[in-house]
Amino acid sequence: VGLTAFRLFPVPSHAQSNSSWWFKNDQAMWELIGENILEEYIDDISNLIEVFASGPFPLYKGRTERISMSELHSYDPLEGLNSPAHTAPALYELKKIVQVIYEKDYRFAQPPKMPTLTATPADGKVILTWDNISDTRTRDPFLGNINDFEGYKLFRATDKYFADAEVITDGYGTPMFMKPIFQCDLKDGKFGFTDFGLVNGVGYNLGSDTGISHVFVDNNVMNGRTYYYGLVAYDYGAPHIGPGISPSENNLVVELDEAEEVRSIGKNVAIVTPFKPAAGYKQPDITIDESNLPGGGKIVPTILARSSIKKDHRYQVSFGIDTIASLPQYDYGFVYTTKSIAVTDLNDNLVVYQENPTKFVSTNLVKNDSLDYWSLNTKAPFSTDVFDGIQLNVDMPFDQGFYDYANSGWVQGSGMMRVVPTIRESSYLAWDYHIIFSSNASVYTTTTSIKTGIRDAVDNRIPTNEILLGQSFGFYVKNETLLKSDGSHVLMDMVVHDVNKNGVFDKSEDKIIVGGMRNDGKWAGTAFVIDFNLASTATYPKSDDIFRVKFSRPFWKDDYLKFTINSYDGIDADSLAKTMDNIRVVPNPYVATNVMETAVSNQFLNQRRSLMFTNVPAQALIKIFTISGVLVDEISINNSPEKGIVHWDMLTREGLEIAAGMYLFHIEALATGDQKIGKFAVIK
């Protein structure tokens, strides 16, 4: 049947009449919708009634007729709308999309599950975190219940309607899209602008294959100003359905009342005001309880979201490894990579965070395609997502072990001795060792009985006639990293390289090959080479001297870091007294308005004036006086312990607007009695 009648008209007078177009007047309304007329409305904007109609048509007893209707809105140039051809390209594009939806039996492509956004205010910044429900739980029935999640976009506005974020125009030059301050997407080869499902000639930006993150720190904010953040998850659309369906994203909902005050917000929206910390506030901090990271990498935990931390909770960071290559028949010789990181809350005995090859942030893990293994990113330091308000900053600048010349040396005593790593096999034996000297000249004797397969520092095979077995040494080499199944340390084997080929062990000329012995008695591999060529009787190491041989290496499965979150309930009285001197009124002078004041779109609403006191105690009393000493207003501050600002609406105690002029303020900290007196000016 199609659309047979359309009328748009003002609400008629409520005077009693049987002929007015009002819903209780059956005959008038029947005649209205039964008339074959499509009439546009160009009169004044007012309270309008919109009537669509199709018909008349017969509706027989027992028969069901289904009616489908679509109401489309577009911005189109008046020149085209008023032309004989009545061109409306934006409207026609919408019609194409609606037609596809109709033909698909109203099964819409759905956006991903809505994330929950959390905003934590700080001094000059806002920390934004969100959960992972969108990227892990999304299923789109329109596309066969697949997870079509693609990424996140984060928007910031100072307007409750997000109007100042809507700066991207469509193909017709009409502002239509919001510009994100942060975007991240899956590393899946889907990036850039779509060439399907164009909205008024504009494709959807799928991102840059950055990898997914669940945290963003916005440093481009001003203390005391209220910001509105919105986070949307988006999918990658449906390019193969009809003309293509554009990617879908979550809605941002900010519900306002008649006074334009926020009534409710969606869970993906956060309203936050950054602030200076309160006078006397003791910031939470972290204590490193125990660090066992001998390999050389660094992990620094930092508190990012104060509101989410758990007081006095202890955490342990641990690692998972993947073996890349190994020495045959030797349990302590292999090349490995660190492929995962996990954090356990020791108080709750619960894993609260982890990254591994199946779930990681951005480029925190990378894959070596040629050898088919995953590793923590060694090219640059990286940060984890936020867990319990904490973020880990990780720096592991190497993916294989190597000799650490800078941190190797004498732990106890001294002497002339040279330690040289091998160019290949050391990477299989990159542990920490102690060379321990003894008063017993035969404290260790060579164990291996087979001369073949022994290599020197430059990876050359040493001829068997240059190998001396059964030699005794006045020192031994202990592996400080690995333990045997009985809990004892692994001892390294040693053989002599008879450099001068005289068949006798000459300490001043020959070299000592240090390595491991296989289960079958053969040499497993060389860790390093020792020589005393430069030592004299006076400079030869003495009994109880210890030399540390250190290798830098990726995080090992037995490495760990333990730390505790410290949160303080009280205030620092000395700090409070000093900070009271820094109390300021912003802006001072107040001239007509300032950026902290929220805009109102209703012309009949008054301006929401605002003046801020900063660096104030969390519990305090402010009294404001005229210059002649008349009390204007009192402000009782009862902030959260960390919040150090308070806004004044610039109204008197009687609810009247204050006059222009000079004012005095008196602030008293309720906890300590410290006081501050100052002044500010108001110019209207």
Predicted features, each with a name:
Residues P58-L72:
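Short Pro-Gly-centered flexible turn/kink motifs
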Residues L78-G80, G655-G661:
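Short glycine/proline/serine/threonine-rich loop/turn segments at secondary-structure transition edges
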Residues D43-V51:
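Short, structured beta-strand/loop micro-motifs enriched in basic residues and often containing a Trp
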Residues R63, S83-E654, A681:
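Polybasic, low-complexity Lys/Arg-rich tracts in intrinsically disordered regions
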Residues V1-D43, D105-R107, Y161-A163, P294:
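Glycine-rich (often Gly-Gly/Gly-Pro-rich) flexible segments and glycine-rich loop motifs
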Residues M662-K684:
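C-terminal tail/sorting-segment detector
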